[in-house]
Amino acid sequence: MIGAGISGLTAAWQLRKAGVRVTVLERSDRIGGRFHSIELNGCRVEAGANFLSAAYRVVPFLAGELAVPLQAVSAKSAIAYGGEIYGFRTDRPTSAVRSGLLPIGTSLGQLPGLLRFTARSRGRGTLDPLDWLDLDRMTAEDWTRGIGLAQLAERSIYPAFHGFYFQDARTVSAAAIGAMAAHGFSSRTLTIPGGLSRLTDALASRLDVRTGTTVAFVEEDAFGVAAHTDSGVFRAEAAIVAVPAPDLPAVMDLTAQEEAVSAVAYSTGLLVCLGMARRLHEDELAGAYGVLMHPDDGPLAALCVASRAGHARGRGDVVTCMFAGKDARALSGGADSEIVDAARRALLVWEPRLSGAFAPAPEASAVVRIPHAMPTTPPGRLAAIDAYRERAQTRRIVLAGDCLAWPWSDSAAAAGRWAAGRVQAVIDRP
């Protein structure tokens, strides 16, 4: 198993439960991939994936298996649209109408479109991209306009996709928007007490994981599979490779189908965790745990407040400012102090009352650069995944990871589960 992110660890755990001996090789000194929790300013802060959803299927099942508790964050959320922050409650969908985000006339006008979406999404899941293959060639903007959801998309779906996945949803495949929306508009947001890393740590503690092991190349040979590393050659009946798509060409010779899925572009993320000298007041940032930004509303993709996830222990707080796309790329090359200053300015545009609340110590804030944050889903991407999965039936080296998944963690975990099933079939093959 090459790669110890959520996809690789899920695959390894699935195989281990089936009685297969698995060794996990991880290049970095840390396991977990996008699950990365850190201590900062008296808070537990997520320096990668920030939340889970009650609509997820694989990750909550893993948490239950491993006795890792889940807890709901504040139900207060917000969307920034047209220069205004609209607060609402995820457990009360009508609150989006009362807030002005979805005016009553707009909401009523979108009902036929919602009925069309419900009918067309019936029987489709949120884990497997191929459930939505028929929408692969159409852009989200064309699709939402065609089914009569243009205004709902503009005011809620596009800000949500941008805030969650650091991408302009108008140009992605209609399939991606449909799958995200199929999670449900009122799903509760979840976290793990002590941070999301508790789950990947729990998985790793039950597996043979070798961190700090760089895989130079993996190949099929006459005896099975050989992984050439800086600490020797590992031989096995089969291998799963769950690394970011841009890393795949360096570690293996790719078939045409593997090359196609590895060509996926990734969104760029820049997380700036700003330490605050006090907890945020209830009316600041609309009282929301997270604020999701429309792609036309400035450089930020989202804001997230640690105390409203139950992650603040002392009197301070942390507000995470998430930059995406060209803004993330432009800022990432600067010094951390410059990036922190830029994040403070961006935050004050939305909440000027925080101008005197920043913790002054440099160590109270942190900058996290994520050059390959999440896979994008342009029209046509799912056809490449479909072609790869058909070809993978005959391979001893199987891909997993987010190159085969939607940009959310539950789908990456499901890709690991799928890869484990393919490897099990290889091992059991006469």
Language-model features: where?
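Short beta-strand to alpha-helix junction loop
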Residues: 50-57, 132-138, 147, 182-204, ...
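Mobile amphipathic helical/loop "lid" adjacent to a hydrophobic cofactor/ligand pocket
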Residues: 59-60, 64, 69-171, 183-185
